[in-house]
């Protein structure tokens, strides 16, 4: 009987291993990437970030972005910041912002996010180039 129980437990473990949803995830299992890295310089620039779960390659929906900062740290000007505001997006896993970029060059959008099912806060920096 013990051998039967062990065999059933092993079979159940193999069945669960084949599911598409990750059983355990980590903050580094997500990638934040610019939809378009080159954006227009000036008022009303549109920035879009795609969040992807690396192991599955699928977009991540329902992310809560609770702290954002937009600065020129890629060009060694951390103190140069820009006003920005979240905008609605209809594309799964894409999070949009409207920004007032005051200078051409590299802009870093720094994000802190709560990802559904993830215990830890996920942090990322997405770089855009204003032209």
Give the location of each predicted region.
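Bacterial N-terminal signal peptides that target proteins for export
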Residues: 1-9
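Cleavable N-terminal signal peptides
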Residues: 11-13, 23
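N-terminal signal peptide c-region/cleavage motif recognized by signal peptidases
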Residues: 18-20
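Contiguous segments within soluble domain cores/interaction surfaces
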Residues: 24-104, 108-131
């Amino acid at each position: 009987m013990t051998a039967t129980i062990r065999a059933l437990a092993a079979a159940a473990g193999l069945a669960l291993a084949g599911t598409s949803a990750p059983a355990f995830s980590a903050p580094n299992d997500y990638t934040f990437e610019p939809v378009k890295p080159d954006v227009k310089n000036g008022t009303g620039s549109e920035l879009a970030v795609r969040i992807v779960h690396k192991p599955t390659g699928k977009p991540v929906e329902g992310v809560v972005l609770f702290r954002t900062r937009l600065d020129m740290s890629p060009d060694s000007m951390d103190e140069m910041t820009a006003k920005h505001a979240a905008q609605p997006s209809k594309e799964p896993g894409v999070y949009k912002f409207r920004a007032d970029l005051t200078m051409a060059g590299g802009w870093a959008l720094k994000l802190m996010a709560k990802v559904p099912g993830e215990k830890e806060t996920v942090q990322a920096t997405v770089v855009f180039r204003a032209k």
